[in-house]
Amino acid sequence: MTPMGALADDPAWAAAFLQRMTRMVARDFNHPSIIVWSLGNESGYGAAHEAMYHWTKRADPSRPIQYEGGGSATSATDIICPMYARTDTDMPQGPDLAPKPGLIKWAGLGGENRPIILCEYAHAMGNSLGNFSDYWDAFRKYPRLQGGFIWDWVDQGLNKTDEHGRTVWAYGGDFGDEKNDRQFCINGLVFPDRSPHPTLLEAKRCQQPFTAKLRSRDEISVTVTSEYLFRATANERLHWQYLDEKRVIDSGDVALDLLPGEVSSVPLFPKDLQQRAASWLNVWITQVESTDWSEPGHEVA
């Protein structure tokens, strides 16, 4: 079998590799939305990648470079960027390859301080994202684990009427094509029309910028943590409901006043705190005013 990096080590292909990189950097250099350069995807590792890396670092020392090929941690990447690594266990990769370390183990390996960002993870096909919270627990606990890119955002399907007259999303094989990608076109967080899958709610819950934990049952106060990095909570309100198995006993809302990264105790003062067999506290946070991307009342956590 030809090694995946065969072309990257073939001098005949060196100019093609470099041209692809130099043209991309020239085209996108002045776009502020570009925060990381990529050398490509799933093309092994070889001398051409090293040449692309060093040319780009000279042309633009302000941005980091990421490349997963060759084991995710070669000298041609500023970010360790594994694909589908597990959180706490190693992953076998075949008889001739060393196991891919679990993320927590990877973060503790000596002699290395590059950030770890999964270039792909949480393959969002079908009834997926069941262990998504495990990743985000690890991201929050270990500073070198800095997130990842979900594969992927949107289903690749086309609107089609089936033999029963129903409108369906068509994909691999639905157009009489015998060689196709089957259901691997349908692995996003949203449908082709951008309406959400249930998995989008799971992603939102794990990635929300606030956490709230019950601090005291006696007085019903919660500890709220803001994960905003740059701004205070000037546009957020915390809403709450105190209820038992039969009814909502009390409810209210309070303005949040947190600096970036601040942790604060928020007393809620519900009425009627008599002892009950079971009671619950629901807490959610909304935005008061509209933003460039949300309407008033949008729930952020």
Residue ranges and their predicted role:
Residues 138-301:
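Carbohydrate-binding surfaces of carbohydrate-active enzymes
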Residues 1-185:
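Substrate-binding/catalytic cleft of secreted carbohydrate-active enzymes
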